[in-house]
From Swiss-Prot:
Compositionally biased intervals (Polar residues): 248-257, 293-303, 313-325
Region (Disordered): 184-210, 227-259, 287-411
Name of this protein: Probable membrane-associated kinase regulator 2
Native species: Arabidopsis thaliana
First-listed, main subcellular location of the protein, grouped into a coarse class: membrane
Length: 411
């Protein structure tokens, strides 16, 4: 057994891979060449071809080639070994890039390929036939003698990052189910009806190459409902958080303002309802206090008002034919005013200047009270002196007693 490696990497749009022998006599080695177009990512495919030429295989007419495919991917490496009864995983993703490579088998001079040997490799996609012009006579004879089997293939790149479209899931599932059904029917047709031997015509040369369409796509892992750019996501998230916080603050401020306005309106309504009742109660209470007859003078305002009303009351009482009930408080005030010396002056003042008169009368009253005290003291002193002088003149024996006890006389 001889292992041959197929080196070269495909890029985005596709290319052709062809097994070409180095020499027809020395060995049956084949080299896989690949031509690639525009690319998105980078992926390396290493394919080894093993041809069996044992005696037992010749006796059993098992002349088909066996392919061992090994894929080295940038994200992760995965080996795919060709064996009987093993089927490689294959899916179709929406919006991928296509790769095309052509496999032409060189089995060393066999006229046909056993369809049973094709069970070693399974593919699922349509065939795209492509012809490469032979570069030498050896290659031409090899391609003529060894027609390739027509295989339907689609290989999914086993990368760790895949893009998922929610809207295209149903469509992709339906397409996959249809492709699997078509593949099963083609398999049965191949097993029951082997292909007829091909003639040496240009059509057979065209069918000697098989082109496989591959779709590979490299995308970053992102969530289904987020944007592809992380900076945009961060800026949008920060802006959304700031806008949400500002909106919450505005809502709280508006709610506080509305609550304050509601409170103010409620207080105004309450005061409007309570104010007339308060005024009525205060008026009634003032009238009761005025007509109760037990008024006292706790504050200067009430005392001044009573003093202002007292001259008018005295005038009305002095007039003949006026029988008016005067409260007891006013009577007391009138008595006090009658005793003072300034009662006459306050009685003659007009009622229009009651405020000024009351202040003047209070000051005069204080002055008069001081004068009265001084007069009484002076009169007492004079009385003592007179009595002392008169007693000394009348009775001289009192002198030593008065001299011995001067304090009694001073008192």
């Amino acid at each position: 057994m001889e292992a041959f490696s197929l080196l070269n990497y495909w890029k985005n749009s596709g290319g052709a891979v062809t097994f070409l022998p180095h020499s027809s006599e020395s060995s049956s080695s084949s080299l896989c060449r690949y031509s690639a177009g525009e690319s998105i990512g980078t992926t390396t495919i290493v394919t080894s071809v093993t041809e069996t030429e044992d005696e037992e295989a010749d006796e059993n007419d098992d002349e088909g080639p066996f392919f061992d495919l090994e894929f080295a991917l940038p994200a992760e490496e995965e080996d795919t070994d060709g064996g009987v009864g093993r089927e490689g995983d294959s899916d179709c993703t929406d919006g991928g890039c296509e790769f095309k490579f052509t496999l032409s088998s060189c089995s060393g001079g066999e006229d046909r390929v056993d369809p049973d040997s094709l069970d070693d490799v399974f593919f699922k996609e349509t065939i795209v036939e492509e012809v490469e012009p032979p570069t030498s006579s050896e290659q031409q004879t090899c391609s003529v003698k060894a027609p390739a089997a027509q295989l339907s293939a689609s290989i999914l790149k086993t990368a760790t990052k895949l893009r998922v479209f929610m809207l295209g899931m149903k469509k992709s599932k339906l397409i996959q189910a249809k492709s699997e059904a078509n593949f099963g029917s083609e398999d049965l047709d191949k097993q029951t009806h082997p292909p007829p031997p091909l003639s040496l015509s240009p059509e057979s040369q065209q069918k000697s190459t098989v082109t496989v369409n591959l779709k590979v796509e490299e995308v970053p892992i992102i969530s289904l409902f987020s944007r592809e750019n992380s900076s945009k996501n961060s800026s949008s998230s920060s802006s959304s958080s700031s806008s949400s916080s500002s909106s919450l603050k505005k809502q709280n401020g508006n709610e506080s303002v509305v609550s304050d306005e509601k409170r103010f309106v409620m207080m105004q309504k309450y005061l409007k309802k309570v104010k007339p009742l308060y005024i009525r109660v205060s008026r009634r209470y003032g009238e009761k206090l005025r007509h109760s007859g037990q008024l006292t003078a706790p504050s200067s305002a009430r005392s001044t008002a009573e003093k202002a009303d007292s001259p008018v009351a005295t005038k009305t009482n002095n007039k003949p034919g006026n029988n008016i009930n005067i409260p007891a408080g006013l009577k007391v005030v009138r008595k006090h005013l009658g005793k003072s010396r300034s009662s006459s002056s306050t009685a003659t003042t007009p009622s229009s200047t009651t405020a000024t008169v009351t202040t003047q009368s209070e000051s005069r009253r204080r002055d008069d009270s001081l004068l009265q005290q001084q007069d009484s003291i002076q009169s007492a002193i004079l009385h003592c002196k007179r009595s002392f002088n008169s007693s000394r003149d009348k009775d001289p024996s009192v002198l030593p007693r008065s001299v011995s006890e001067p304090s009694s006389y001073e008192k």
